[in-house]
């Protein structure tokens, strides 16, 4: 990207910092995850969780959700102004699982939000540490991306369900800041904008008055975020058109859907970072590891090393396969839901299979599920190699891709051809190049038609041995390109119900 000099790295966005050198970034990211770890250890004490229970990913998720809810100011304000029966606006909670007489028991707990905020601040040197909160949101978002398909949401906004590789971060809350915006896929931004435009079409006061002015500012800001994800001039010019639209309506929606489709071949830059469950950081802190002193990076070897020696567990339903549950969580930890399975396969060193073939449902257990039959097993989150996470979409090449998901969004900076189904994608671009964006549309279609299969993405980038911490000897894997590479291939994953 040409503008690299003016961009903050997303490690800096993550920690809310201004420009820092590499050592300072590593220290501030370390401070952030260390704070999450200290908070987790304290919460385990508070809830009297023993070591085994503290390593349970379901307990980790409940604790993460409690602190996120305690700091959700908008929702807290709303709850206080609209008291609903049976909901205490000052309390938050969820299911905590304990081991009793060889069985797992569910206990629904409630805690004062004020108390949780106090514990969180105390673990973070008295600060609000919003970066740490965002980090947990991104972990939840990555878990959702890996677990659910967003077919219904795509169809509702007039997009094609096969565009699911563009939907990274689609369940991230609006309040996730710059770090959240960096990990949102092109499709996610398009969907948010289309929802906004549709509200404007249905509600004539949406863009009017003082509120409307704020809405307009938010609209333009979202347009700029999306524009920044595109790597070609024509796509960016088209985003300027959408942003400057006097009265955003169907023309803008058409343009946005066109742009989303174009991103299947002319990929956008979407950041990827390995965000781990709080219990993993907690385990390291409890064992005396000093994240701030040692430094930490979300895009390098550190998360791989951390997972190499963390033993965490998950509850397993009767018909679920523990190895499949492990794959689900491994992919979520590395934000690899839309990565080419062949790449994930190579890095993980064990077979990574498409979502539809996984005998596992989501990680969380519903409150009406019977605990009698529920067991637990160790999650296998180790890897054979590590690779640097990417923030670019890579350049594009022509390859066979699948019926269910027709493109990938790379997570790891590893040399490969990027598969996409040109015939399927181009079929969506029939005819409609008239109107105010006609020259840009023509240019974008021309670029898509010229994307060649010989082009290899991430030239010379490879994976590294776990002993190679400085990334000195890249191993460039060779992939069998005749095989299927999409995770949501012709798939029947459950829908995410927001």
UniProtKB/Swiss-Prot annotation:
Modified how: Late in virus-infected cells, may be cleaved from a 56-kDa protein to a 53-kDa protein by a cellular caspase. This cleavage might be a marker for the onset of apoptosis in infected cells or have a specific function in virus host interaction.
Keyword Isomerase: no
Molecular-function annotations in GO: RNA binding; structural molecule activity
Biological process, per Gene Ontology: symbiont entry into host cell; viral penetration into host nucleus
Any one cellular-component term (Gene Ontology): host cell nucleus
Region (Disordered) location: 1-21
One protein family per Pfam: Flu_NP
Keywords: Capsid protein, Helical capsid protein, Host nucleus, Host-virus interaction, Ribonucleoprotein, RNA-binding, Viral nucleoprotein, Viral penetration into host nucleus, Virion, Virus entry into host cell
Motif (Bipartite nuclear localization signal): 198-216
Motif (Unconventional nuclear localization signal): 1-18
Assembly and binders: Homomultimerizes to form the nucleocapsid. May bind host exportin-1/XPO1. Binds to viral genomic RNA. Protein-RNA contacts are mediated by a combination of electrostatic interactions between positively charged residues and the phosphate backbone and planar interactions between aromatic side chains and bases.
Its biological purpose: Encapsidates the negative strand viral RNA, protecting it from nucleases. The encapsidated genomic RNA is termed the ribonucleoprotein (RNP) and serves as template for transcription and replication. The RNP needs to be localized in the host nucleus to start an infectious cycle, but is too large to diffuse through the nuclear pore complex. NP comprises at least 2 nuclear localization signals that are responsible for the active RNP import into the nucleus through cellular importin alpha/beta pathway.
Family: Belongs to the influenza viruses nucleoprotein family.
Protein known as: Nucleoprotein
Species of the source: Influenza A virus (strain A/Equine/London/1416/1973 H7N7)
Lineage per the UniProt record: Viruses, Riboviria, Orthornavirae, Negarnaviricota, Polyploviricotina
